[in-house]
Amino acid sequence: MTKLELLAPAKNLECGIAAIDHGADAVYIGAAKFGARVAAGNSIDDIRQLCVYAHQFDAKVYVTVNTIIYDDELEATNRLILELQEAGVDAILIQDMGLLQFSILNSQFSISLHASTQTDNRTPEKVRWLRSLGFRRVVLARELSVEEIAAIHQQVPDVELEVFVHGALCVSYSGLCYASQHCFGRSANRGACAQVCRMKFDLLDADGRELEHQRHLLSLKDLNQSAHLEELIQAGAVSFKIEGRLKDVTYVKNVVAAYSQRLDSIIAKHPQEYCRASKGHCSYTFTPNLKKTFNRGFTTYFLHGRQPDIFSPDTPKAMGEYVGTVKELRRDSFNVAGTAAFANGDGLCFINKEHELEGFRVNRAEGNRLFPQQMPRNLRPGMALYRNNDMEFERLLARQSSVRKIPVTFKLSETTDGFSLSALGTTVSIVCEHQQAEKPQQENIIRQLSKLGGTPYECSGVEMPDGFNYFIPSSMLADLRRQWVEGKNQGDRFLIESNQTTCPHDSRPSDPPHYDHPYLYNIANRQAQQFYGVQEPTAYELRGGNGPLMQCRHCLQYAMGYCVKHGGQKPTYKYPLFLRLGDGRRFRLEFDCKHCQMNVYAE
């Protein structure tokens, strides 16, 4: 039976616990340093607490150490990995092959390694190479189609494939974006991306003719594969990853619950083929709705091939759900044509005639007549209106919004000198006199054993042998119940620790895939140099480079309708095309039609 894992982001301990409570089978979280989100660091103690909580449900905790490392950071990074291993972490996500070199040479190292999407995993050859190095799981590039995912699974079936299913998209293949480093000295491969792709650009042809003026031409919509999970499962993916280690707890609650319910519905259709990777069922106080939390509009990206509507040129900000159109304007209010219900405090927005996003807060809602705190000057009848902050929904999620419990059927049995209690592979016993009861005891036994508050368990039944009618004092039943909970938790911790093993690497790994430019290997330290067998570091952050700053499957030529390969009209502009930032800096575009890829170069 195939275990399916819903993998959720955790900015901090609070978000990690919320993710588990709302149905995640695993969470990924950053340590204090060396994660791909500088602003999402956590202490070893918080990570240890998260491991203890998650492991109650057989859920996993993965820690991101997925930046490139400099020589003066190697000792601290190596020490961090061993500390995370001791804290009970289930796997480490890495980008820097210097850390793999450390794992091979250090006998203390026993934790599983996952190849981060930052290692640019888009071909069967790359995944096969990673498998030969000992990676048991590979996080695939977001750009892959379902057919490409299936091909990787068919050719490298013993590697677990992790795919992104929801959240923000990088316009460049992950790990190969150097635009932030080039423009601002902030390395995306060091967790400090300045999000150049979310900025405004002019698009110019070779004669300087302006084809687009100050649009967000590289800003992609957010990924949403919630309707396509079954396709991804059939293609061979086993872990379904939600992006968002900078997102708040309400985002985590809503998105995790939505995807957990969808996975459960798929499993209900195929109970003999699939099951969840962790234990427990969730009871929600709200109905999950992906449109109600942060999103830039949704796309399935390249899941079914190239699509025209994958980017959001008007704004890189969250627009939220469509709620209607502006109908009638008055001095201090307006009407909305639509069926949505509004609440005081809702955040609404619209795209004005200059293609810019404007937002405002609703001070008072009287049905479909809304009174903003201040009337937007550029609001016009007929404009589409979006809600990017739903106050009623936020209030629901601000409270406890889910309870996760593991159903337990106890088996109570007689022993030679007392009684034993068994469930879920754990058995405990007490010494107690076998005293026949004067009246039936089943009701009291069930009541006492069901008092599992403050634990992840709920009693779904108690099995007793036929004719079992002993009097067992309530205090002893309570002691038996407490012993079982303690024994179960200790057994789970031992099981998790015993499962911390690396995937053996081949004695003769295959050769690494070839890159045309040395900096694309991201070699930034002596351990990585030793791994690749080179004498000098080649990382762009240290040496620069003349190759592409970005390699994108998103193509502006296709988006404008000028891709002849896909049935577009013949271009009327003169090559090459350039992107220009507001400060005048230009970037040359190269359209690699053979590989269906747009490359961005510094001019």
Question: Over which residues does each language-model region extend?
Answer:
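Alpha-helix capping/helix-boundary segments
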Residues: 98-99
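An active-site metal/cofactor-coordinating segment within enzyme catalytic domains
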Residues: 39-43
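Surface-exposed amphipathic alpha-helical tracts and adjacent flexible/coil segments at the periphery
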Residues: 1-22, 26-36, 46, 50-51, ...
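Arg/Gly-rich low-complexity intrinsically disordered repeat tracts
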Residues: 104-110
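Aromatic/His-enriched, Gly/Pro-containing loop or helix-boundary segments
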Residues: 116-124, 139-141
